[in-house]
Design a protein with these regions (language model features):
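Bacterial N-terminal signal peptides
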Residues: 1-8
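Boundary of Sec targeting at the N-terminus
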Residues: 10-15
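A subset of solvent-exposed loop/turn segments in beta-rich extracellular surface proteins, enriched
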Residues: 16-199, 244-264, 280, 343-368
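Transmembrane beta-strands of outer-membrane beta-barrel proteins
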Residues: 40-46, 87-89, 94-96, 157-163, ...
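Residues on the lipid-exposed face of transmembrane beta-strands in outer-membrane beta-barrel proteins
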Residues: 78-89, 142-152, 209-215, 225, ...
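An acidic- and aromatic-residue-enriched active-site/binding cleft used to recognize and process polar
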Residues: 166, 228-230, 302
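Loop-centered beta-sheet repeat module
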Residues: 170-243
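Outer membrane beta-barrel transmembrane domains
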Residues: 238-368
Length: 368
């Protein structure tokens, strides 16, 4: 058990927190392909985003209690899970938005992934040495947004600035290092978590600013840039900081995504506060018009830069379809965009049994 409990008034950390996305790929594509609109009537919008992405195992197996035997061949392992649901009101240049979402991100080295796969399948190989290095970054929050759009060049482009106010209901950041050998795991755990605190103490606040600019640079080419969390500040007033020595012969994931160590876990808990910033995400894109059709080039920076190329064509008045393929790793995207409706589906493989990355976005709007 945890053997020392210390209460501390304030403790600062320089940390980066992962947040749900502000823009969807479908919205970014629509702004490149169409002229911006400032509704003269009150417009209502709702959107939903679900995304899961990893390089360890097929998504279909993610909730299975027992896995088939698998070998992990990469040097770096990760799992990302995002959910976003929000509701917006727009009038002319102003947009007011409210929603909630979560962002879960886990990463680690090759041995951390293999230890997880072995413990969930045939069992840990007692003769093998697993040198584990793993971390997690999780948030659940509500977000209020005020956005203002400035039209550019005869309303063919626009600059947008969005101010977000965050109410954080869950925050977890941690790191686990250690070695598994001869059926025994010995390591060090450092975890910042709101888990175990009363709900009124677990809440935090934050503020972020997003920026985007989309404008024509020639008669046929339009360029765009989107910056999420360009400026940000997050305050989590109450956290449990767990610093512990882990010694266990049983390995299984717990609710924090780390090890459930029974019965030996020695260390200390301190009550701390956290000042952090949100992780920045950058996207740049360009669309080359060819008659009614367009070629699209996009580059997005999350963990690394990911380049995508696509093609769009109309299927009716104010209706478009676009296809896109991304590299490293390969990702296929298809979307339908109309004046009121957007739907996007992206997968790395069309076979559900082997897909490791998938995203669905649905957006619908109407005027009052």
């Amino acid at each position: 058990m945890i053997c020392v409990l210390v209460l501390q008034g304030y403790f600062g950390h320089s940390q980066t927190v992962t947040l749900p996305p502000s823009w969807t790929a479908a919205e970014q594509m629509a702004s490149l392909l169409n002229e911006p609109k400032s509704p003269n009537r009150l417009q209502v919008e709702t959107r939903t985003l679900i995304r899961a992405d990893n390089n360890v195992l097929p998504l279909k197996l993610g909730d299975d209690e027992r896995l088939p035997s698998m070998n992990f061949s990469d040097d770096y392992a990760y799992f990302a899970n995002y959910r976003l649901k929000d509701f917006a009101l727009s009038y002319r240049r102003w947009t007011l938005r409210h929603g909630y979402g979560k962002a879960d991100f886990y990463d680690g080295n090759k041995d951390a992934a293999q230890l997880y796969l072995d413990s969930m399948s045939v069992g840990v190989d007692a003769r093998k040495v697993y040198n584990v290095n793993a971390s997690l970054n999780r948030t659940f929050l509500r977000r209020w947004t005020l956005e203002y759009a400035i039209p550019l060049k005869h309303n063919q482009g626009q600059i947008s600035v969005a101010l977000h106010w965050l109410r954080i209901h869950r925050l977890q950041k941690g790191k686990l290092t250690g070695q598994m050998w001869l059926g025994q795991f010995d390591g060090d755990l450092h975890l910042l978590t709101t888990r175990g605190l009363p709900s009124n103490e677990a809440r935090g606040n934050g503020m972020t600013i997003d920026f985007s600019a989309v404008a024509p640079i020639s008669r046929r080419i339009k360029f765009g840039i989107w910056g999420e969390n360009v400026f940000s500040k997050i305050w989590q007033w109450n956290l449990q900081e767990i610093t512990a020595k882990v010694a266990t012969n049983k390995v299984e994931p717990d609710a924090d995504g780390f090890l459930h160590a029974v019965p030996f876990l020695q260390g200390r808990i301190e009550k701390v506060s956290l000042k952090a910033r949100a992780k920045r995400i950058w996207t740049i894109g360009a669309a080359l018009q060819q008659g009614d059709n367009s070629w699209i080039l996009m580059a997005k920076k999350e963990r690394n830069w990911r380049i995508s190329i696509g093609y769009s064509f109309p299927i009716g008045q104010r209706k478009q379809v676009w296809f896109m393929v991304s590299e490293r790793p390969l990702l296929w995207q298809v979307a339908i965009i109309t004046a009121r409706f957007q739907f996007l589906l992206s997968v790395d493989k069309w076979n559900v049994a082997t897909a490791k990355e998938a995203m669905t976005v649905v957006r619908y709007c109407w005027s009052l």
